[in-house]
């Protein structure tokens, strides 16, 4: 009986751990917030992979996990960087980008049964998504 109970705990724990969201690493170091770029990550609802958190990766470091119907934003220093998204335990699909000072960049997460994808969208497209999503705060100090 004890083995069955422990097996159920492990199974349900594994299922719910995929639903976690929030910081899993550190945000990019920004020394001058008045000059920082802002990155907004949007994860709208989709049926595929809806029970799995997407790991957002900036400059090859995991920074946060995000669930469906959430969006988050974070500051980043201007310059050349990479951003990506991945399933926990799988390689990252990275995008190279050049961030300009004081600019906003919007990225949307797509998913299928094999992996996540990340693509840049316009502000107009982002605002249409955001109105139906929950904001996930990453840090009280984010401007």
Model-derived features: where do they sit?
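Short loop/turn and low-complexity linker motifs enriched in small/turn-promoting residues
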Residues: 19-143
């Amino acid at each position: 009986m004890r083995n069955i109970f422990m097996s159920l705990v492990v199974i349900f724990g594994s299922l719910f751990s995929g639903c976690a969201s929030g910081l899993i690493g550190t945000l990019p170091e920004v020394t001058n917030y008045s000059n920082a770029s802002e990155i907004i990550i949007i994860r709208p609802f989709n049926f595929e992979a809806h029970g799995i958190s997407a790991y957002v990766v900036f400059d090859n470091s995991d920074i946060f996990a995000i669930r469906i119907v959430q969006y988050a934003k974070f500051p980043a220093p201007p310059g050349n960087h990479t951003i990506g998204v991945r399933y926990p335990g799988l390689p990252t699909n990275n995008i190279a980008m050049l961030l300009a000072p004081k600019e906003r960049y919007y990225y949307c997460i797509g998913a299928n049964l094999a992996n996540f994808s990340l693509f840049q969208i316009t502000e107009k497209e982002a605002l249409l998504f955001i109105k139906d999503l929950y904001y996930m705060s990453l840090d009280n100090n984010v401007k």
